[in-house]
């Protein structure tokens, strides 16, 4: 018996696929139904990791399966290639971002090809290719012309050492994530996209995405944050500050709690706060301290609540005899609503934390059902549930929603404000003070202002002759690139030196894949054919930003006439991460798994260093990461076990939407399965054998094989790859129960049929092994071109049926009967069932109704 050797087999079949160009996408008019499967394209870090293996193996299963079903499959690959890591490499290693990026792409391309994925590499591109980002610049200018792109001064996080703007998530404890410098708040002129113009469409469009995970749709809905509430103004008690004669405008989603107001709060960046700070050093200091804190919403939410009493007071809009203090508070966001709130501590946790700290009143106005208004109080947690309004004059007795409506009506009737819809979503700031990004294609002219670069001068390409020996943006100090002439007046002008947020690059790449040679940004005919993507696969960490921006840009490009679809991804699957135990030595230093030896005695596991024998601490199971060294190199696994074993393991150990824990024992189990599988193919003798279904062993094997088709098909369709693999494992036992050695002609015929089916069913999971097995069986051509097997309904049908039994309409048990059993036989079995007999005790059976192979209804009294 020939031993299966993946080191020889796997490269051989990858070469055969490449030579035959089997994965090249067919023409859009070739008559086959289309199927577009796409995994989120990778950043070219230089090496693939096990997360990549899982992600792309899943996509490959779908692509190969659909191809076998007769679909014209588009399964492309590209590179999300702009971004900070390349600039960091330039600064730290003295290499050019361009060279570093393309070297990494070359390395990762070979690694991904070694995975055996069925990608049409002829459509490959990187977002740093001038051909790609030139097309991006072209549609950007169209959006600029339409007014969807604009500039405005905005408050940003400025790193004074790296001399660049940081996203909120890059500010850690008030310091730059890379430099460690204290971050400053500055106002800079930035470029924005009006994503808020599409807020309603983006929320409403979520209802059409029935093949998206509910949690992702909910995350996007919450991120957009459409809320209906009240916008109104507090009048100042006494003289109003400059420019505030008309009052202090606030927005609230809880007008029902107005009578529970304890104070009014404004953001540290609010114009009133800045006005007061100009004349008050203490307020200046307080605002400066607020700016040192974290700037992400999560950090602001969890930070200690801090405030400063301005000394100003405002009048309650529904009862002017009540006045409220105005505080500057660090938890209020300037870019939500108006940057000012009224605070009702009894019914908002942040307000309550603040009120407790500064000894401000807590006035409950929503009474939970069943509580006594005379004794109800609020403790450590604010009450945010339903109830009846009390302590609120004319609102008393109303439920929350009715009270909201009444409060809005009263405010509107008094011309003090109006009901309003507000969004948490802000316009998308796309300016980045970076070199390694897509240049913004505009020119600044003193005479003409902002002038778009003419389309025939695109792409505006990045200059190669830049240095990274100084902090800041190299484009800003380039001796020639920055300086140009105005396309409008011919005078001296300067190029825009900001580059675009890399989320722009990934917001439309799926559309470019439809026709990578199109002269327009998007080949309309091809895009109309291929879009939307039928199945998109990627990590849930991209649930909000990337997916939201892609949905927005798709709608914007549709409005430009470049696309015909509103939603880019019809189906979305978010796979879990690949995890591994993390290990430390006694000094607290992370240790790689390859340097750890683990022994198990009973339920106790201990670890030591493989080389030194020193004790090792076994830590938690965590996402594989370089920082914790709990990574397993895919190439090492491929070398030791073969690619197919690695592919099989990442899809077999847990449901694909959950994390999978990498273990050596797990991949060894997959390796053993591939060898057992091969042995079944290798042991089958050549020849034509006649079927004989009177042979019970042969018939049982045929039935198992045809049932397997349905199981595996359903598992792929439902993204339950682990269930499909489990069925393949089970079927191997059925094959072993009918060995070739000494078998009858009927069993050999059944085995030949079963192995023919099996080779095609395992092909999406273990494609190299499947090709070798197909060739060993004498299959026509390659298995990659073979059609998906179709089950014989007679053979795939269950021999038995489980029938529920109802007595007078209530389920009282179930019985097993042969499929198609006569009614009288079913009745006899049902009435003899002990559970049924117990429920019929003392009753007379009047009628038994048998619904063939489905249910038994008994009428008795």
From Swiss-Prot:
User: Does this entry carry the keyword Transmembrane helix?
Assistant: no
Which InterPro entries does the protein's record reference? aa-tRNA-synth_I_CS (IPR001412), aa-tRNA-synth_Ia (IPR002300), Leu-tRNA-ligase (IPR002302), Leu_tRNA-synth_edit (IPR025709), M/V/L/I-tRNA-synth_anticd-bd (IPR013155), Methionyl/Leucyl_tRNA_Synth (IPR015413), Rossmann-like_a/b/a_fold (IPR014729), tRNAsynth_Ia_anticodon-bd (IPR009080)
Protein's cellular compartments:
Cytoplasm
* Positions with a binding annotation for ATP: 626
Primary location recorded for the protein, binned into one broad class? cytoplasm
Disulphide bridges: none
Q: What UniProt keywords apply to this chain's record, in alphabetical order?
A: Aminoacyl-tRNA synthetase, ATP-binding, Cytoplasm, Ligase, Nucleotide-binding, Protein biosynthesis
User: What SUPFAM superfamilies does the record tag this protein with?
Assistant: Anticodon-binding domain of a subclass of class I aminoacyl-tRNA synthetases (SSF47323), Nucleotidylyl transferase (SSF52374), ValRS/IleRS/LeuRS editing domain (SSF50677)
Q: Which residues form the signal peptide?
A: none
Catalytic activity from the UniProt record: tRNA(Leu) + L-leucine + ATP = L-leucyl-tRNA(Leu) + AMP + diphosphate
- GO terms (BP aspect): leucyl-tRNA aminoacylation
EC number from the UniProt entry: 6.1.1.4
What stretch of residues is annotated with the motif 'KMSKS' region? 623-627
What GO molecular function annotation could you give as one example from this UniProt entry? leucine-tRNA ligase activity
Q: Give me the Gene Ontology terms describing cellular component.
A: cytosol
Q: Where is this motif: 'HIGH' region?
A: 42-52
- Cross-referenced Pfam families: Anticodon_1 (PF08264), tRNA-synt_1 (PF00133), tRNA-synt_1_2 (PF13603), tRNA-synt_1g (PF09334)
Family, per the entry? Belongs to the class-I aminoacyl-tRNA synthetase family.
This one is known as Leucine--tRNA ligase
Q: Which organism is it from?
A: Caulobacter vibrioides (strain NA1000 / CB15N) (Caulobacter crescentus)
What broad taxonomic lineage does this protein's source fall under?
Bacteria, Pseudomonadati, Pseudomonadota, Alphaproteobacteria, Caulobacterales
Primary gene name: leuS
């Amino acid at each position: 018996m020939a031993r299966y050797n993946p080191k020889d087999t796997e490269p051989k079949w990858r070469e055969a696929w490449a030579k035959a160009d089997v994965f090249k996408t067919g023409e859009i008019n070739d008559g086959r139904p289309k199927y577009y499967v796409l995994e989120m394209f990778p950043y070219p870090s230089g090496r693939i990791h096990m997360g990549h293996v899982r992600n792309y193996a899943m996509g490959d299963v779908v692509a190969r399966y659909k191809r076998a079903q007769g679909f014209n499959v588009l399964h492309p690959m590209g590179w999300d290639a702009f971004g900070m890591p390349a600039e960091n490499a330039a600064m730290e290693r003295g290499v050019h971002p361009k060279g570093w990026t393309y070297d990494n792409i070359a390395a990762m391309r070979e690694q991904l090809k070694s995975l055996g994925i069925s990608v049409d590499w002829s459509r490959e591109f990187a977002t740093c290719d001038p051909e790609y980002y030139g097309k991006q610049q072209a549609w950007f200018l169209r959006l600029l012309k339409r007014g969807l792109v604009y500039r405005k001064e905005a408050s940003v996080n400025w790193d004074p050492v790296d001399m660049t703007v940081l996203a909120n998530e890059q500010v850690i404890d008030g310091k730059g994530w890379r430099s460690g410098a204290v971050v400053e708040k500055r106002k800079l002129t930035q470029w924005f996209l009006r994503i808020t113009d599409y807020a309603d469409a983006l929320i409403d469009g979520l209802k059409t995405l029935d093949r998206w995970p509910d949690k992702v749709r909910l995350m996007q809905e919450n991120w957009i944050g459409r809320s209906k509430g009240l916008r109104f103004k507090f009048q100042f008690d006494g003289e109003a500050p400059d420019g505030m004669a008309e009052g202090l405008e606030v927005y609230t989603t809880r007008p029902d709690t107005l009578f529970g107001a304890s104070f009014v709060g404004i953001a540290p960046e609010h114009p009133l706060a800045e006005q007061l700070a100009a004349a008050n050093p203490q307020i200046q200091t307080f605002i400066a301290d607020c700016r040192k804190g974290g700037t992400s919403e999560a950090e602001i939410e969890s930070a200690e609540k801090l405030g400063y009493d301005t000394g100003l007071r405002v009048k309650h809009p529904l009862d002017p005899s009540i006045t409220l203090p105005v505080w500057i508070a660090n938890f209020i966001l300037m870019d939500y609503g108006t940057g000012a709130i009224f605070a009702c501590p009894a019914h908002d946790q942040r307000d309550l934390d603040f009120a407790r700290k500064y000894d401000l009143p807590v006035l409950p106005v929503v009474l939970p059902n069943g509580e006594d208004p005379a004794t109800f109080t609020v403790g450590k947690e604010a009450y945010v549930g339903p109830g009846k309004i009390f302590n609120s004059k004319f609102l008393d007795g109303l439920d929350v929603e009715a009270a909201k409506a009444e409060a809005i009506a009263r405010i509107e009737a008094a011309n003090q404000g109006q009901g309003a819809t507000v969004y948490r979503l802000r316009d998308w700031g796309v300016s980045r003070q970076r070199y390694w990004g897509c240049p913004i294609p505009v020119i600044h002219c003193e005479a003409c202002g902002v002038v778009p670069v003419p389309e025939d001068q695109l792409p505006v390409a990045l200059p190669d002759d830049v240095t990274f020996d100084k902090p800041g943006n190299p484009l800003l100090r380039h001796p020639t690139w920055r300086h140009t002439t105005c396309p409008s007046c011919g005078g001296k002008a300067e190029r825009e030196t900001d580059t675009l947020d890399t989320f722009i690059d990934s917001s439309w790449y799926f559309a470019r894949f439809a026709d990578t040679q199109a002269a327009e940004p998007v080949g309309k005919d091809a895009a109309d054919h291929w879009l939307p993507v039928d199945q998109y696969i990627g990590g849930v960490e991209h649930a909000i930003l990337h997916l939201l921006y892609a949905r927005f840009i798709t709608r914007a490009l549709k409005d430009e006439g470049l696309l015909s679809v509103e939603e880019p991804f019809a189906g979305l699957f978010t796979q879990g991460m690949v995890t591994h135990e993390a290990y430390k030595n006694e000094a607290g230093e992370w240790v790689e798994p390859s340097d750890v030896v683990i022994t198990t005695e009973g339920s106790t596991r201990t670890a030591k260093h493989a080389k030194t024998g020193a004790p090792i601490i076994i830590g938690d199971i965590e996402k594989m990461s370089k920082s914790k060294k709990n990574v397993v190199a895919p190439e090492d696994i491929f070398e030791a076990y073969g690619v197919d074993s690695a592919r099989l393991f990442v899809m077999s150990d847990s449901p694909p939407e959950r994390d999978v824990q990498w273990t050596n024992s797990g991949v060894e189990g997959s390796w053993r399965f591939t060898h057992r599988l091969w042995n079944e193919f290798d042991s089958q003798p050549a020849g034509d054998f006649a079927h004989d279904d009177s042979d019970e062993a042969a018939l049982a094997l045929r039935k198992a094989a045809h049932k397997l088709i349905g199981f595996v098909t359903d598992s792929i369709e439902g993204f339950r790859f682990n269930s499909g693999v489990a069925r393949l494992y089970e079927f191997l036992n059925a094959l072993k129960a009918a060995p070739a050695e000494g078998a009858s002609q009927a069993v050999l015929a059944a085995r030949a049929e079963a192995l023919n089916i099996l080779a095609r069913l395992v092909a999406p999971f273990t494609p190299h092994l499947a090709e070798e097995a197909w060739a060993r069986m004498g299959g026509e051509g390659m298995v990659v071109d073979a059609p998906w097997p179709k089950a014989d309904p007679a053979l795939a049908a269950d021999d038995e049926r489980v029938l529920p039994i109802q007595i007078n309409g209530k389920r009282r048990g179930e019985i097993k009967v042969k499929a198609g059993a006569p009614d009288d036989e079913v009745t006899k079995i049902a009435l003899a069932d002990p559970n049924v007999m117990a429920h019929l005790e003392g009753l007379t059976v009047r009628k038994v109704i048998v619904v063939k192979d489905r249910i038994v209804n008994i009428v008795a009294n």
